[in-house]
Amino acid sequence: MKYILLEIRLFFVCMSFLTRIPSPRWIGFQEEWLHHSIKYSPSVGFLLGSLQWFVFLLFQFLFGPTIAFTISLGFLLILTGAFHEDGFSDFCDGIGGGWKREDILRIMKDSRVGSFGAAGISLLLLLKVLGVSETFHQYEIKGLPFTFGSSAQIHLLSVWLYFVTAQSFSRFLSILMMKLLPYAKEEGYAKPMAKEINWPQIYFACIFGVTPFLALVYLHPYFLLSLLCIIPSFVYMFSLMKRWIQGFTGDCLGAVQQVVETCIWISGVFVWISI
């Protein structure tokens, strides 16, 4: 019973760290819980993806898929406080404006948004909206999307998995990056979560991080082609971090999450158009 209670606490600690969703008061907080709670990051993504899907489903009947997705994206930004988007913006400023490791880390730490950050986050959000919009446009769908001759339940399930995968799988790969690289700073906001991450935590994160992706591939095998976009992007992000700062920071993890999520959104264009 104590173990179950601890795991519940770890989930809420992770959710409180990554989002603005309030947790029950009885959860409490201990700093060492942050490290153990990181395995629940994909689970939080699973929840966020489900909530985003619900908002999208609600508004698409009123405004169509493009506006509905934009609203759902705004809803998610409110829930998370643009936590990962802020990291992506700082990452763009650091990598774009710094030539030395110390300069890059200093720029990333600066809370002000620079030209690279503003341009990067604008393009990122635009790619998300246009990617999903183009996917729906290919089939000229105004109601339930992804009509492949299957039942309405499969349509709903496919879209739900699409949204959940974008949020959970991207957070799983963000955790994986923590295992592949060391923490780049002596101190930082993400350091309590980053220390001593182990493979059992990675395996646990697979439950909610990888399962939705595999389920979507099972329903629509062509979605496996999305890895042609995801893997090179992940490797490129890894190479940038290893080359320029010899590790990762919290901003880097946010950038990885956002890049992979965007890859998943735009993958719908060349995956479902092939079916």
From Swiss-Prot:
Its EC number is 2.7.8.26. Pfam families: CobS. It is a multi-pass membrane protein. It is found in: Cell inner membrane. One of its GO terms (molecular function) is cobalamin 5'-phosphate synthase activity. GO terms for cellular component: plasma membrane. InterPro entries: CobS. Its cofactor is Mg(2+). It is an enzyme of class 2 (transferase). GO terms for biological process: cobalamin biosynthetic process. Its main location: membrane. Keywords: Cell inner membrane, Cell membrane, Cobalamin biosynthesis, Magnesium, Membrane, Transferase, Transmembrane, Transmembrane helix. PANTHER family: ADENOSYLCOBINAMIDE-GDP RIBAZOLETRANSFERASE. Joins adenosylcobinamide-GDP and alpha-ribazole to generate adenosylcobalamin (Ado-cobalamin). Also synthesizes adenosylcobalamin 5'-phosphate from adenosylcobinamide-GDP and alpha-ribazole 5'-phosphate. HAMAP family: CobS. Belongs to the CobS family. This is Adenosylcobinamide-GDP ribazoletransferase. It comes from Leptospira biflexa serovar Patoc (strain Patoc 1 / ATCC 23582 / Paris).
